[in-house]
């Protein structure tokens, strides 16, 4: 018989002595980014990661006429690799985002969101 074990990504955080467990750092604060969307609207995004592998993605869009839209999305997250440099964020069926080349340090979270042409950087807000 052939048995296949389905790995739970790299979520037990028991990475051995060779790697520093980055989950505590990731979950230690709210991560905030300010940017302009494709239409030039001013946007604020906040990401919260929790140790139970859930998270909240909050986006506020301010329009030139003064109107404001706010969106809140829940997601489940996991580390995609042993070195904890890639985060998988699942918002629902067929709705998954990846943050690659993750850097956490100096009150910053940065990486490439869903592709090499989309570098993002968040500042920590305690």
What residue spans do the PLM features occupy?
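Lipid interaction determinants
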Residues: 3-74, 83-126
């Amino acid at each position: 018989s052939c048995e296949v074990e389905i790995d739970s990504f790299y979520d037990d955080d028991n990475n051995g002595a060779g790697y520093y467990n980055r989950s505590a750092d990731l979950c230690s604060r709210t991560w905030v980014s300010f940017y302009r969307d494709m239409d030039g609207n001013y946007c604020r995004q906040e990401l919260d990661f929790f140790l139970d592998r859930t998270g909240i993605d909050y986006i506020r869009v301010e329009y030139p006429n003064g109107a404001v839209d706010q969106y809140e999305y829940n997601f489940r997250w996991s580390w995609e690799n042993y070195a904890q440099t890639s985060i998988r964020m699942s918002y629902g069926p067929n709705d998954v985002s990846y943050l690659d080349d993750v850097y956490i340090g100096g009150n910053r979270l940065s990486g490439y969101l869903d592709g090499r042409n989309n570098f993002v950087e968040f500042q920590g807000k305690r």
